[in-house]
Curated annotation (Swiss-Prot):
<comment type="subunit">
    <text>F-type ATPases have 2 components, F(1) - the catalytic core - and F(0) - the membrane proton channel. F(1) has five subunits: alpha(3), beta(3), gamma(1), delta(1), epsilon(1). F(0) has three main subunits: a(1), b(2) and c(10-14). The alpha and beta chains form an alternating ring which encloses part of the gamma chain. F(1) is attached to F(0) by a central stalk formed by the gamma and epsilon chains, while a peripheral stalk is formed by the delta and b chains.</text>
</comment>
<keyword id="KW-0406">Ion transport</keyword>
<keyword id="KW-0813">Transport</keyword>
<dbReference type="InterPro" id="IPR000711">
    <property type="entry name" value="ATPase_OSCP/dsu"/>
</dbReference>
<keyword id="KW-0066">ATP synthesis</keyword>
<keyword id="KW-0139">CF(1)</keyword>
<keyword id="KW-0472">Membrane</keyword>
<protein>
    <recommendedName>
        <fullName>ATP synthase subunit delta</fullName>
    </recommendedName>
</protein>
<dbReference type="InterPro" id="IPR026015">
    <property type="entry name" value="ATP_synth_OSCP/delta_N_sf"/>
</dbReference>
<dbReference type="GO" id="GO:0045259">
    <property type="term" value="C:proton-transporting ATP synthase complex"/>
</dbReference>
<comment type="function">
    <text>This protein is part of the stalk that links CF(0) to CF(1). It either transmits conformational changes from CF(0) to CF(1) or is implicated in proton conduction.</text>
</comment>
<comment type="function">
    <text>F(1)F(0) ATP synthase produces ATP from ADP in the presence of a proton or sodium gradient. F-type ATPases consist of two structural domains, F(1) containing the extramembraneous catalytic core and F(0) containing the membrane proton channel, linked together by a central stalk and a peripheral stalk. During catalysis, ATP synthesis in the catalytic domain of F(1) is coupled via a rotary mechanism of the central stalk subunits to proton translocation.</text>
</comment>
<keyword id="KW-0997">Cell inner membrane</keyword>
<dbReference type="GO" id="GO:0046933">
    <property type="term" value="F:proton-transporting ATP synthase activity, rotational mechanism"/>
</dbReference>
<keyword id="KW-0375">Hydrogen ion transport</keyword>
<dbReference type="GO" id="GO:0005886">
    <property type="term" value="C:plasma membrane"/>
</dbReference>
<comment type="similarity">
    <text>Belongs to the ATPase delta chain family.</text>
</comment>
């Protein structure tokens, strides 16, 4: 995974810098999201691996599949990525682009997994507290996992806060073993 991220980083950075300079972050995020989804299609993956097709043919086919969703700059970007045989990296490029975008917008996606469903008031309160702690706008994504027994697990980028009963039991069991 780290190697793919390393290979994708210069493309994501270039796309981000272009989109930021032209105030098109949302458009480029959508275009790269579409490109990532298209590149993960089984038929498209077979086409991208076809040794008989040139990089120009792969790029042209890729752009045709996406229809008119790509502007001229995005089409040029796809051609450059294809020339370097990096079209399979589009999901990583899109993910890195979105990270750069979130960093620039001072926002963060936070995944909250709880043992029981959180109502809207609880989600709003949690988002407010996390926003104050992280110093960013929080986009909360709530999920439910009964195996947690109780409490919540919060994931925001590299930060993980495990306040679940299952996590506490696991820590206690580890402490008893040592």
């Amino acid at each position: 995974m780290a190697e793919l991220t390393t290979l994708a980083r210069p493309y994501a950075k270039a796309a981000f810098e272009h989109a930021q300079a032209h105030q098109q972050l949302a458009n480029w995020s959508a275009m790269l999201g579409l490109a990532a989804a298209v590149s993960q299609d089984d038929t498209m993956q077979r086409m991208l691996k076809a040794p008989r097709l040139t990089s120009a043919q792969k790029a042209t086919t890729f752009i045709e599949v996406c229809g008119e969703k790509f502007d001229a700059k995005a089409q040029n970007f796809i051609h450059v990525v294809a020339e370097n045989d990096r079209l399979p990296l589009l999901p990583e490029i899109a993910e890195l682009f979105d990270l750069y975008k979130a960093e620039q917008e001072k926002s963060v996606d936070v995944d909250v997994t709880s043992a029981f469903a959180l109502n809207q008031e609880q989600q709003d309160k949690l988002a407010k507290v996390l926003s104050a702690r992280l110093g960013r706008e929080v986009r909360l994504h709530a999920a439910e996992d009964a195996s947690l027994i109780g409490g919540v697990v919060i994931r925001a980028g590299d930060l993980v806060i495990d306040g679940s009963v299952r996590g506490k039991i696991a820590k206690l069991a580890e402490a008893l073993k040592s």
